[in-house]
Amino acid sequence: MAGTGSPQSEPRVPGVAAEDRRTTLARFLAAASGAHAVEVIGLTPLRGGAIQENWALDAYFSGGAFSGEQRLVLRTTAPTGVAASLDRREEFAVLKAAFAAGVTVPEPLWASDDPEIVGKPFFTMRRVEGTAAAHRITRDPALDPALPAIAEQLGRELARIHTIRPPRADLAFLAPYEEVGPTHQIAGFRAYLDRHPTPRPVLEWGIRWLETHIPPPTEPVFSHHDFRTGNYMLDGTVLTGILDWEFSGWGDPHEDIGWFCCKGWRFARLDREAGGIADRAPFYRGYESESGRSVEPRRVFFWEILASVRWAVIALQQTDRYMIAGERNLDLALTGRRATECELEILMLLDPGGGASGA
């Protein structure tokens, strides 16, 4: 996992000096890994991760299975967050499940809820190389020849994620699909807008359309719920990791497909409907060949509309973190404008009579 420094400081334990924090972290790593001793060489913030904090953790392990210098990531909770996010222990568990299912993810290593180590819950994973910068991936001409193949591989990766099915004892903390399916999500959007001080009539209209077009139930699968460009790493043209699992849970398989294809995640390449990198065909082909399941365009269309509403609500929540909760982060402040972009997309996708161009 790569990135550049941000203005945040090292994770803090109140009343404990930075050097002592590194010592405490080193002791945890030694105990968790079975090493004789560990020296924390570097702990540097990484850009990206709008919901959580990521730190490049370089450490030297003396003895044990990890002997030598290791390049890791420490992932912990941001000062403020989004209510739908899993906690770090839960995210660690879903990352382990994805890793075991053969999904290309950073290998999860160790987790802790002990606030005495870095001040809040965290987990560690191997650091993978490359970039997740969406605008770079979608706009770099050097990548263009490889992007259809990357889209096809991403379709296969998504199908592997969807091989995880309920019930799972290791994922027992996930809410049942009946409590997180489209009906529940739509009700949550409406409740949020009812509390919001600013009227959003286009979102209300989109919500009403969703309420009257919910597709028939389907067998739930494990869904990433934020599978998109910007949440995977590329090292050149090589996919090195699917990232940011904090929203994952049980869902309709078409939900992840609709989210990936939503216009809000094309990053100025609106002509490339699959994540801003390719046409839908290679992405769908990869998914269908790996899963043995056909993609249903009508279901995808419903989930694209829901994705636009959901992204708009998340954008408003991110702005709340800046305006109300006081988290001074420019990215959070700027995210609010995305809500208006989502509203425009809803207007373009749904015709004035309340029907759908894709339904």
Give the role of each language-model region:
Residues 2-37:
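Juxta-kinase regulatory segment immediately upstream of eukaryotic protein kinase catalytic domains
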Residues 42-209, 213-219:
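ATP-binding pocket architecture of kinase catalytic cores
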Residues 177, 294-306:
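All-alpha amphipathic helical-bundle segments outside canonical DNA-binding/catalytic cores
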Residues 220-222, 240:
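Conserved protein kinase catalytic-loop anchor
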Residues 222-224, 229:
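Catalytic-loop of the protein kinase fold
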Residues 243-248:
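Activation of the activation-loop gatekeeper triad in protein kinase-fold domains
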Residues 255-292, 306-325:
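Active-site activation/catalytic loop segments of kinase-like enzymes and analogous catalytic loops
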